[in-house]
Structures are given as C-alpha cells and as structure tokens.
Amino acid sequence: NNTGVDIMAIPFFSIDFKMSEWSSIFSVFLGFSSRSKQEKKLLELLHNRFPEKKITLFPSARMAFYFVLKNTFKTGDEVIFPAMGFPLYVKIALQLGLKPVYVDVEDEHFTIDVEQLGTAITANTKGIVVTHLFGYPCNMDEVMKVSNKYDIPVIEDCAQSYDSFYKEKETGTFGYAGIFSC
C-alpha cells in the first residue's frame, strides 16, 4: 500500500460447528415438515416449563407483540411503556392507533421506575408494558400492585430475560402476556 493510509487486515474466523449443529441450522431453512418437528419440540419444552400457561408460537417477538396489542386494546387507548425498551414496540402501538405514555426507568437496571408508574395512570390507561432489560427483572410486586389496583393488564417483554426470575417466579408469568424471543 503506497497511499500512506494504514489499512487494517480484517480477520477471518472459521465457524466450527459439529454436523449435528449444522443439521439443526439447515432444518430451519428446509420445508414445513422440518420446521413443524422443531416447533413441536419447542412447544413441548415450553409446555413443560410453563404448564399453567397458554403458549402460542409466532415467527418473531414483533408479531407476537402486534397480536397481543391488537387483540387487547382499541384505538385511542393509552399504553404505558418504559422510556428504555425496544422502540419498534412503540411503533407497533402507534400503528394500531394506541397512545404510548412513557415512564422513566430506574438507575440500577434500567427497568421501569415503579415509583413513577402509579402517577402515569389516567382514566385512559388500558395497559402497561414492562421490559425485563439485560436479564434483570422489573420490580414485579410493585408493577402488579398498580395493575391490580387499576385493573390494567401487564404485558411483559421478556426478549432479554429468558430464564430470569423475580423472587423465584419466572419472568413472563406475572402479567396478562409474556413475550419471549429466541
């Protein structure tokens, strides 16, 4: 290189999967029957893990969130969101004609600030979305107190909290709906 510009070599990494791992990866891209087998396995695992819950699989957490919002709220309803979360969920709410209301997050784990949650409730508030961010559960005791006091459903965004627990109870099992992603 005679341009006087240093060029960094981009390292090449080998992806070293076992044959069984490649088989699993490729089965996702094969026909419906292969996916159907994988879906059945996943449903069985989830039913064993959450025996008291109704499980529905979606192609993405976004689609699940859309489905829950569309079938739970109506145009003009206010839904509380944490100020820090997945921005696309707010966009989905807006597309459905819902009115997002933001509640700030607490300083330690950046989950919804439960001290501010109660003051954000109005007569038009019809839902609360909480995000268990970075594997840290929200203070679900306080969230559910507000939910029960005002009879408002809680939707838990658990995309970052699979296998996380709040006081020995798994995230996604407190509210009206828990949405996981893998």
Functional labels for PLM-detected ranges:
Residues 45, 55, 71, 92-96, ...:
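Alpha-helical structural signal in soluble globular domains
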Residues 57-58, 81, 127-130:
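A short beta-strand submotif of the Rossmann-like class I SAM-dependent methyltransferase core
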Residues 68-120:
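Conserved PLP-anchoring active-site segment centered on the Schiff-base-forming lysine
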Residues 52-54, 58, 105-108, 168:
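Short, acidic/glycine-rich phosphate-metal binding loop used to engage nucleotide
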Residues 60, 84, 133:
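Flexible loop residues that form catalytic
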Residues 1-67, 71, 148:
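Conserved PLP-binding active-site segment in aminotransferase class I/II-type PLP enzymes
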Residues 108-181:
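Active-site phosphate-binding strand-loop segment of PLP-dependent enzymes
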Residues 56, 80, 101, 153-155, ...:
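Structural detector of well-ordered beta-strand residues that form the stable sheet scaffold
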